[in-house]
Every structure is written in C-alpha cells, then in structure tokens.
Amino acid sequence: MPGAGLFIFVAAALCEIGGCFAFWAWLRLGKSPLWAVGGVGLLILFAWLLTRVDSAAAGRAFAAYGGIYICASLGWMWAVEGGRPDRWDLIGVLLCAVGSAVILLGPRTA
C-alpha cells in the first residue's frame, strides 16, 4: 500500500480539506454560496478516494488516513491561509505521521 496508497491518502486529504474550506469560505469569509457546491463535489471525491485504498478494514484505512489528514491540514494552513505552523504543530504532526506509518507499514498476519 505505501506508494499508491500514500498518493490516494494525500489526494483524499486535499479533497477533504478543500471541500471543508469551501464551506468555511462561504460561511465564515462571506464568499458566494456557490463555494458550497464545489465543496460538496470535493467531499464526494474524498469519500470515493478512501474506498480506493488497498485495506481489508475500513477502520484501519481511516485511522492511517487521519495522520495524513493532520499533516495535510497544517500544510494547507501554511500554503493557502498563510499561517505558519508553530513548534507544537510540528511536534503534533510528527507524532501523527509516526502513528500513520506504524498503521500503514506494520506487519500483518494473513
């Protein structure tokens, strides 16, 4: 799962974050309600992408994805919103990335 799975997780994270941000922009930043239409589309794509990950259990896929989502969220904050992560953000991201790696790469019995 590492190569393609990681790509799918990152794509899913960008879709989820973009979809949620579309609602944030509409409801918190005063953007047009049309932002919500795009947001819904991205959230549907996000959900579909998670079903493409090679995992026997949805819960394991979702748990591993959670760490990727947290990393991507702070990247979004920095790249899109201009907010720079502080040291506590970075420590938290590191812990989440390690947790996701353990879930993704840990040996499994057949």
UniProtKB/Swiss-Prot annotation:
InterPro entries cross-referenced by the UniProt entry: UPF0060
Major subcellular site: membrane
Keywords: Cell inner membrane, Cell membrane, Membrane, Transmembrane, Transmembrane helix
A single Gene Ontology CC term: plasma membrane
Localization terms from the record: Cell inner membrane
Membrane topology: Multi-pass membrane protein
Pfam family, one: UPF0060
Transmembrane segments: 6-26, 29-49, 61-81, 90-110
Keyword Cell membrane annotated: yes
Domain of life, source organism: Bacteria
Protein family membership: Belongs to the UPF0060 family.
Protein name: UPF0060 membrane protein Swit_0423
Organism for this UniProt entry: Rhizorhabdus wittichii (strain DSM 6014 / CCUG 31198 / JCM 15750 / NBRC 105917 / EY 4224 / RW1)
